[in-house]
Curated annotation (Swiss-Prot):
It comes from Rattus norvegicus. The lineage of its organism: Eukaryota, Metazoa, Chordata, Craniata, Vertebrata. It is a multi-pass membrane protein. This is Transmembrane protein 39B. Belongs to the TMEM39 family. Glycans are attached at residue 8. Keywords: Endoplasmic reticulum, Glycoprotein, Membrane, Transmembrane, Transmembrane helix. Residues 1-53 are annotated as: Disordered. May protect the cells against DNA damage caused by exposure to the cold-warming stress and facilitates tissue damage repair during the recovery phase. Residues 31-53 have a biased composition (Low complexity). The gene is Tmem39b.
Amino acid sequence: MGGRRGPNRTSYYRNPLCEPGSSGASGGGHSSSASVSSVRSRSRTTSGTGLSSPPLAAQTVVPLQHCKIPELPVQASILFELQLFFCQLIALFVHYINIYKTVWWYPPSHPPSHTSLNFHLIDFNLLMVTTIVLGRRFIGSIVKEASQRGKVSLFRSILLFLTRFTVLTATGWSLCRSLIHLFRTYSFLNLLFLCYPFGMYIPFLQLNYDLRKTNLFSHVASMGPREAVSGLARSRDYFLTLRETWKQHTRQLYGPEAMPTHACCLSPSLIRNEVEFLKMDFNWRMKEVLVSSMLSAYYVAFVPVWFVKNTHYYDKRWSCELFLLVSISTSVILMQHLLPASYCDLLHKAAAHLGCWQKVDPALCSNVLQHPWTEECMWPQGVLVKHSKNVYKALGHYNVAIPSDVSHFRFHFFFSNPLRILNILLLLEGAVIVYQLYSLMSSEKWHQTISLALILFSNYYAFFKLLRDRLVLGKAYSYSASPQRDLDHRFS
């Protein structure tokens, strides 16, 4: 009694949070302060392995107290799309200045030019198609706002119908007229280059659909009756994929309205299901950011250059630099809109419930008590479990993640710190602004000076909003850190 345990003495422990009914309990709101059973497992220790059994306090599941962040103003979707469209038009305008600039400051004795641009060299049909492609999100937001359902007055319904009809008719007529002119003027290769990004759009955003397995482009004449029926079914599956992809794309256009919610529960299976849904939602938002930014940079920087005559000189290095600036700036602006502060806080709450595991060398814990991992248990911090012939140590307050699942580890790594996304965006946007300021001070050409000065304004606004969200979230989490430490000390 009170002596040191021998190597053959049996250790007893209770399964962590596996009491009946514990897996189905759930809580609401922003906290999960329901009474949680503590786990006290005795374990053998050894001084030669370098790894000791965690203390009793480390094996007690501490209730999570989620931080309540203030409600930050969210920009309306139609205003955001107007702002993004305006920034893209500015970038397109400065690129046309780079391509079609003139020597208007020369005296009349030199080659005369009364305007700052060679307007007679600009193809306005190509400019119209490029403008419509860049403004597709803004046009879609107008149509969505004009298609709202509900009880509205007769005058308002007529006004919404006329707005929707006018926008769609004007856009469709302008696009068809410009495309017909381009078909008559340019070769098939040029038109293929113009429409190339849309050919990659659906395959990039498809919903777990493998085009290599469908053989959609096989010859119909070589198919028998059964193959024809199966090919028709595959084509229907393909069009279903297109429809679902377009629905997801249009849903992601309006980030704040489609914001998911957090279910603060104590069921391990429900927590993992919520994390899977949030992973899918986050991946969709990142795909939308990547595709939209690359599409904007493509039509701003590359399309005008491709249709320039071979005898026309322009600064190729500046065109490539503009492509990078537009792609990075558009990515940051879209991520700031699709990943607001409330969404970062939502991902952080889910990561706190999910927990994380660290793989441990079995040779260092051979004499330490190890529990077999079960999916219906909520494991406390510091406990050792066996899973897939490996040993893992629990790191979070709640640990319901699958130890061998790399996606769960990545989710907890990225979102365990609620400020990580905002910090990355701030560093990226700050680096772009510093580079633009350096280029602005060192530039000697008038068109580059105008271009950098105009593009800087959009980056200033995005940097201000990111800095505001970062400061507010940082203050909120710093205030909630001390009560959480007091709660941890009380449970220990």
